[in-house]
């Protein structure tokens, strides 16, 4: 059986906060940190919208959630290395607040729900941090900018505000069964939403209608939060990588690019599908779709633990070059075009990124200052470890703003046939994105969303 394949069964347990705390502590100690140290983290504060008394949308701090599994605002936690004790602090009962919001979770309820050793109210944070014979000789680890003014670390000999954030970011790269189960569940819910959008596309008159279909499908399955702002792009709007207006009329455009994913208990899905709005590709859009699908399949098949992500990104470009040469959009030799980086005009972004609590998850070691345009926006650099989850999202785009400077560049324009290119502007963009779990021997694809040509055209026509 695949890892966490029966995700509902896995999710009957508790979020593994204690294992995460141990993992982070080990990372710190292995890097020369204090074996007697203490981790201190704060939840996000509940805030009001500016100039009114309505609550702003709440998003839990991911660093806090990773060591707690707790989505309550205004909370705190500590993890003591020597005693292996994880303590959560949650807001006490405020009588006036109960009138409006009902009774909050009690410490007893929190201790039963979360993978922690003890739970107290936030009134006890500073007494808990007060001096003892142990803390007087140890180090407190915290994240700068995430320490309340009223919190004091005076009892600790050392205060380290550098290692903890980095430690958590690296530890988040490799996922537990529980985390994989959450991502699987988010993918299943999002897949249902993608299918519903495909079925609704032919009758839609505006991009916003299809965004509404996606959101409804997620919310009615209790996935009320989106991992990111959906991209619902018809026709040439799909050439804008992070198009978020989602409000253009749907008229004669051929393709719809839908990049959308819900989150489940703070864990994201990130799925892109491109499909013909009426169920039939044009010759040009079908040709580009076939290239992108080939790019994705070959790159996914090349993955396993220890593979260099840079090399997979290069593979995607070489497949794109070969395909565009066959169509006549590019001309010349594959290696010459690759060396000139001409394919970046059509595939300007990185092949993918780590996925977890954030859509663009931590630990990727991106180098946005890279002078090589092919790698500047590659969000993961280096080898992929087992149990990492990464998106594989190749694309080919016909964006005038990006391509036209290449047509004016003496080195680049020799590789592009402008007459052939002219037929493809209306394609806009094609991107196909799956969420891939890397294993020791290969991969598990966490994204069951249809992408084969016969599948997606049949779904659209069935609407």
Curated annotation (Swiss-Prot):
Binding site for Mn(2+) 1: 270, 393, 433
GO biological processes: proteolysis
This protein's name: Probable Xaa-Pro aminopeptidase PEPP
Function: Catalyzes the removal of a penultimate prolyl residue from the N-termini of peptides.
Cofactor binding note from Swiss-Prot or TrEMBL: Binds 2 manganese ions per subunit.
Keywords: Aminopeptidase, Hydrolase, Manganese, Metal-binding, Metalloprotease, Protease
InterPro entries: Aminopep_P_N, Creatin/AminoP/Spt16_N, Creatinase/aminopeptidase-like, Pept_M24, X-Pro_dipept-like
Coiled-coil features, chain-numbered ranges: none
Gene behind the chain: PEPP
Highest rank taxon of the organism: Eukaryota
Top EC class, one word: hydrolase
Assigned protein family: Belongs to the peptidase M24B family.
EC number: 3.4.11.9
Catalytic activities: Release of any N-terminal amino acid, including proline, that is linked to proline, even from a dipeptide or tripeptide
One Gene Ontology molecular-function label: metalloaminopeptidase activity
Cofactor: Mn(2+)
Binding-site positions, Mn(2+) 2: 259, 270, 433
